[in-house]
From Swiss-Prot:
Region (Disordered): 496-515
One of the protein's GO biological processes: regulatory ncRNA-mediated gene silencing
Name of the protein this chain belongs to: Protein pid-4
Keyword terms, alphabetized: Cytoplasm, RNA-mediated gene silencing
Subunit structure: May interact with pid-2, app-1 and prmt-5.
One GO CC term on file: P-body
Chain's role: Together with pid-5, it is involved in gene silencing mediated by a class of 21 nucleotide PIWI-interacting RNAs (piRNAs) that possess a uracil residue at the 5'-end (also called 21U-RNAs) and guide the Piwi protein prg-1 to its DNA targets for silencing. Together with pid-5, it is required for the biogenesis of secondary and tertiary 22G-siRNAs. Specifically, promotes the production of 22G-siRNAs from the 5' end of target mRNAs.
Subcellular location as annotated: Cytoplasm, Perinuclear region; Cytoplasm, P-body
């Protein structure tokens, strides 16, 4: 290898290195080993589903069934995309036929095939391999109560003497104990937005006030999260459809790809229209306005009341979307704007279900305050923060990677008290709320050809390189069927050699435990 060239390649930017990898893989006869493993898992899942169906039928007839199948539980927080999971201690069958229950494994069973019986092996045989990870959790729980472990620790830490004095540093989380953000908060007032999506733009009729709008948009998004319900998400990989923007607090606002925004708009509009039709004529004219009886006569510290729509969640009535069935839309008031001195003032809103910006003239026919009954409808907008990102440049690089790959890895969630706060508005039956406020995203896994395995214990090798095989992949060992066999197939008697469906034996011997 030319060391001079190798040294030059180290100085290449990530984009230049990516182009080098594309040129390296182009035209080569390669295939992905992870796809073989995925096919095996799909085959197993299909067999497992059939057996579960048969088990349900047999159990319904009063026949007890003692079977447990292979359970593959991958680490969803790992950035390795080539994990091979083989949980030996929960593998009681292959999903297509019964297996006798294996004997309990001991630690000594994995040391060798032939081991002399010694005092050490006798002690090892007393240590059973646990099927559930209860011993470690019990150890951590007991020592946490004794004060040896001040904060929750990772399960993978070894239980040594040094572990007793180990102290972990929790990730800093934003203080969300009070859902109402204080106006005197300097960070709140000085916030601005960056890394805007192409579709997330200020409307054309208020471009000249761009110096004011970014700060107000950031404030509106930050205040929106505690006041609107969100979907429940799982840890692990998530497909991101759009990154709206980021702010100076190093948070970003994304819309996962799993949500159909058009369908959400139609569902909400139909739901709101059904609710609206049940109101009386007086309630239809006054709800969510200054004329609402629930609002009249109220003042704040002797000061004039702010408009009913001011920096709260509202309902927009957009006649231009009536034919599409999405006329009624949820939104958050951002700020008031005046395009020109000679023109009347407008108000800027951000839609809760799409993240789109709308500037329109506010009146009783176009804007109403959002009834509390609809606050628990989840929004697809998810607030995220990036683990390890310390500057806005770090956030910009992470957002650029998400927009390029369309994927992100959720490590954990920052939770608040949305459920307690929102249910305080209801005197009757409390509604379902999610306390998820911010998703913590792991740094992206960089593709590397310098090492075969990553740090994940279940890595099969060459992880995170499948993206380079998309255009160069070819299946190994492709075979063709001779034309002569096809011609003679109808002449020869055809014998179905496919395996028959497994049938339970008549006796109950299969339920006896293994010897």
């Amino acid at each position: 290898m030319n060391t001079h060239n190798a040294r030059d390649s180290d100085d290449e930017s990530p984009l230049e290195s990516e182009e080098h990898l594309k040129r390296f893989f182009a035209g080569r006869n390669l295939y992905s080993q992870t796809k073989i493993d995925d096919a095996r898992k799909k085959s197993h899942d299909a067999k497992y589903a059939k057996e579960v169906e048969w088990d349900a039928k047999d159990t319904a007839k009063g026949k007890p069934v003692f079977k447990k199948y292979r359970q593959e539980i991958a680490d969803k927080t790992s950035r390795c995309d080539a994990q091979f999971i083989n949980n030996l201690h929960t593998y009681y069958g292959n999903g297509s036929e019964l297996r006798e229950l294996p004997e309990t494994h001991y630690a000594v069973d994995f040391m060798g095939t032939t081991i002399a019986t010694t005092e050490m092996t006798a002690e090892l045989k007393k240590l059973k391999v646990l099927k559930k990870k209860t011993a470690t959790s019990q150890f951590v729980r007991e020592h946490r109560q004794l004060g040896f472990i001040p904060t929750p620790s990772r399960r993978s830490l070894s239980c040594t003497g040094r572990f007793m004095n180990f102290e972990t540093k929790c990730d800093e989380r934003p203080d969300r104990t009070n859902p109402e953000f204080s106006v005197g908060n300097n960070n709140f007032l000085s916030a601005t937005i960056s890394n805007l999506d192409e579709d997330f733009k200020t409307p054309s009729n208020c471009e000249h006030v761009a110096s004011i709008v970014p700060k107000e948009i950031s404030n509106a998004l930050t205040a929106l999260i505690p006041h609107v319900n969100v979907f429940d998400y799982e840890k692990g990989e998530m497909e991101i459809g759009k990154v709206l923007c980021s702010n100076k607090n190093l948070h970003a606002y994304v819309i996962p790809k799993q949500h159909d925004q058009e369908q959400m708009l139609k569902d909400f509009s139909a739901r709101f229209l059904a609710w609206y039709n049940k109101l009386s004529h007086l309630q239809r004219d006054t709800f969510g306005t200054d004329k609402d009886p629930k609002r009249s006569g109220k003042q704040e510290d002797g000061k004039p009341m702010k408009p009913y729509f001011w920096r709260v969640n509202v309902i927009l009535c957009l006649q231009e979307f009536q034919e599409e069935g999405t006329m009624f839309r949820r939104a958050r008031h951002v700020c008031g704007i005046r395009p020109h001195k000679s023109q009347p003032g407008l108000d800027l809103y951000i839609e809760i279900d799409t993240g789109s910006m709308r500037a329109l003239k506010t009146n009783y026919l176009t804007v109403r305050k959002l009834p509390q009954e609809f606050a628990n409808v989840p929004t697809p907008i998810l607030e995220v923060r990036f683990e390890g990102a310390k500057t806005e440049e770090d956030v910009a690089r992470r957002i650029a990677h998400i927009r390029k790959t369309g994927r992100a890895y959720i490590k954990s969630f920052d939770t608040g008290k949305r459920k307690i706060y929102q249910n305080s508005f209801f005197n009757g039956q409390p509604k379902d709320w999610s306390n998820i406020e911010t998703a913590v995203l792991l740094p992206p896994k960089e593709s590397s050809m310098s090492k075969l395995f990553c740090e994940d214990r279940d890595c099969m090798g060459l992880c995170c390189t499948d993206q380079w095989l998309e255009n160069a992949e070819s299946s190994p060992g492709i075979s063709t069927i001779p034309a002569s066999w096809i011609a003679d197939k109808n002449k020869k008697p055809f014998v179905d050699r496919s395996p028959q469906k497994f049938k339970f034996p008549a006796s109950g011997s299969y339920m006896k435990p293994a010897n």
